[in-house]
């Protein structure tokens, strides 16, 4: 039997044309590849008589080569030719002559040892991950093995996970802890049934693994049935080992971000030593997960003595405090009249609410949202933790606590306030000056306890803050040491929720243990924020150092009216804010300018009256000349001097 022609190139060209036409009719992308291969085969200068040569042609791959080999086989059968061996081996999925030769050479070698198969490692989800939480939720919640819905699993799994079970695309969090359900199903640990409303249940392997996880952690039951309670406090936080909250907090404490050196400093309500605070400040540089307590010792009910209070303050502060105390003791107290029968002190009426007449409610600012599509996240999650809360617009702060009278419905503001910041928002506030202004407004509220809560962002966003890392560390250090705020840094929004829930219970139990009476101020009119703060300070000085536990508080409506950003502001405060609107004018510079020019009118007259004879170029340098002897951040440079002139000198 004769073989086909020696050069098969003309046959391959014909078959490639045919394949290209068919692919074009079908509208497939293969038409492009066949046309490219056709052009390359046409231009190939040498004969093509074996698969190796055919594959060496550009744009001719394995699939094209097999296609042409099959066409050659049909051609040979039709014309009664013998198919070349090399092409026959390619069609049958065999190996070429060279490979066959290699195989035959190795056939005489002794049998090689069979390769030991690696045993597949059992999948075990990481502790406090989404998969870990889902397994435990199904183990505790699906005793009848009938399955749980997604919502039921999330409700039960949340206490076991460090990550939220809801994604938040607005914060670049596209995956949630619930994404782990796919891994559990892939490894046959969890199965599901149904379509529209799926039910999930543990397989036998999943049940055994969940039981092992439960035994390893020593869980007896799901914490979802136990609420935050059984706390024991004196004048500091102390959680009993067998309390239900202790079991929940152990899970939170298992992550580094929730660890503190002792429970007394967890909420900043108990006294802490200066040395321990310094330790935490030093830890700031080495640990990105910062849990801190304020520098100044805090006392929950009784006011500290002047000597112990002064021991943590600079010398100048101590001297000024001493003078102020002397002034109060000698002059102020002498003219402050207290009529206990009519409940009037220094012309201000007050009421007394005894324990049992009021309930404590957590109030969240309505601008505190998780995302535009999930605006009720805080209220929903806190309510699921049995925390009574409400959402309203707040004049200052993001979270406060109020006491509501059970009969009259009147509310008073308690001495606790929180400012919550995502790390990206903190960076923005540092850049535009809001950071310092917001802390000053918090201070004017006259509260005892200030909490500054910082939430981390996803890892991909952390790279954006590389050049701001030093500024972030400095800002947080100043918040603790200078502002005396209790700063807490969290890994996720779920940790913030857990902290607020537990702190609410701490406040309630503190009131119950001390049998605290609320002394409610009924001020008729308050002119500004300074008067608001001074009035509450006078009442605290009078009533909160007695054997009977009192807490002085303004009405919530008074707090809202007095603490508004624009309302109740003095000319000085308004002028400083106007100056800070100029890019580059920090709070320190704005205060320095206001001290030199008391009102906006004085600054305008400085340019238009006192120095009206100067040229425009000289006027632009005036502010730089006026503040050339200032120290540090109060000094004004050439560029900033020109900016101030452009705003105030060209009115």
From Swiss-Prot:
<keyword id="KW-0234">DNA repair</keyword>
<keyword id="KW-0233">DNA recombination</keyword>
<dbReference type="Pfam" id="PF02732">
    <property type="entry name" value="ERCC4"/>
</dbReference>
<keyword id="KW-0540">Nuclease</keyword>
<keyword id="KW-0469">Meiosis</keyword>
<dbReference type="InterPro" id="IPR006166">
    <property type="entry name" value="ERCC4_domain"/>
</dbReference>
<comment type="subunit">
    <text>Interacts with EME1.</text>
</comment>
<dbReference type="GO" id="GO:0046872">
    <property type="term" value="F:metal ion binding"/>
</dbReference>
<dbReference type="GO" id="GO:0048476">
    <property type="term" value="C:Holliday junction resolvase complex"/>
</dbReference>
<dbReference type="GO" id="GO:0004857">
    <property type="term" value="F:enzyme inhibitor activity"/>
</dbReference>
<feature type="compositionally biased region" description="Basic residues">
    <location>
        <begin position="115"/>
        <end position="124"/>
    </location>
</feature>
<dbReference type="GO" id="GO:0031573">
    <property type="term" value="P:mitotic intra-S DNA damage checkpoint signaling"/>
</dbReference>
<dbReference type="GO" id="GO:0008821">
    <property type="term" value="F:crossover junction DNA endonuclease activity"/>
</dbReference>
<dbReference type="GO" id="GO:0005634">
    <property type="term" value="C:nucleus"/>
</dbReference>
<keyword id="KW-0460">Magnesium</keyword>
<dbReference type="GO" id="GO:0003677">
    <property type="term" value="F:DNA binding"/>
</dbReference>
<dbReference type="InterPro" id="IPR036388">
    <property type="entry name" value="WH-like_DNA-bd_sf"/>
</dbReference>
<dbReference type="InterPro" id="IPR033309">
    <property type="entry name" value="Mus81"/>
</dbReference>
<dbReference type="GO" id="GO:0000727">
    <property type="term" value="P:double-strand break repair via break-induced replication"/>
</dbReference>
<dbReference type="InterPro" id="IPR047416">
    <property type="entry name" value="XPF_nuclease_Mus81"/>
</dbReference>
<dbReference type="InterPro" id="IPR047417">
    <property type="entry name" value="WH_MUS81"/>
</dbReference>
<keyword id="KW-0479">Metal-binding</keyword>
<dbReference type="GO" id="GO:0000712">
    <property type="term" value="P:resolution of meiotic recombination intermediates"/>
</dbReference>
<keyword id="KW-0378">Hydrolase</keyword>
<feature type="domain" description="ERCC4">
    <location>
        <begin position="361"/>
        <end position="458"/>
    </location>
</feature>
<comment type="function">
    <text>Interacts with EME1 to form a DNA structure-specific endonuclease with substrate preference for branched DNA structures with a 5'-end at the branch nick. Typical substrates include 3'-flap structures, D-loops, replication forks and nicked Holliday junctions. May be required in mitosis for the processing of stalled or collapsed replication fork intermediates. May be required in meiosis for the repair of meiosis-specific double strand breaks subsequent to single-end invasion (SEI).</text>
</comment>
<dbReference type="GO" id="GO:0006265">
    <property type="term" value="P:DNA topological change"/>
</dbReference>
<dbReference type="Pfam" id="PF21136">
    <property type="entry name" value="MUS81-like_WH"/>
</dbReference>
<dbReference type="InterPro" id="IPR042530">
    <property type="entry name" value="EME1/EME2_C"/>
</dbReference>
<keyword id="KW-0255">Endonuclease</keyword>
<dbReference type="InterPro" id="IPR011335">
    <property type="entry name" value="Restrct_endonuc-II-like"/>
</dbReference>
<dbReference type="GO" id="GO:0006308">
    <property type="term" value="P:DNA catabolic process"/>
</dbReference>
<feature type="region of interest" description="Disordered">
    <location>
        <begin position="99"/>
        <end position="124"/>
    </location>
</feature>
<protein>
    <recommendedName>
        <fullName>Crossover junction endonuclease MUS81</fullName>
        <ecNumber>3.1.22.-</ecNumber>
    </recommendedName>
</protein>
<dbReference type="InterPro" id="IPR027421">
    <property type="entry name" value="DNA_pol_lamdba_lyase_dom_sf"/>
</dbReference>
<dbReference type="GO" id="GO:0048257">
    <property type="term" value="F:3'-flap endonuclease activity"/>
</dbReference>
<keyword id="KW-0227">DNA damage</keyword>
<keyword id="KW-0539">Nucleus</keyword>
<comment type="similarity">
    <text>Belongs to the XPF family.</text>
</comment>
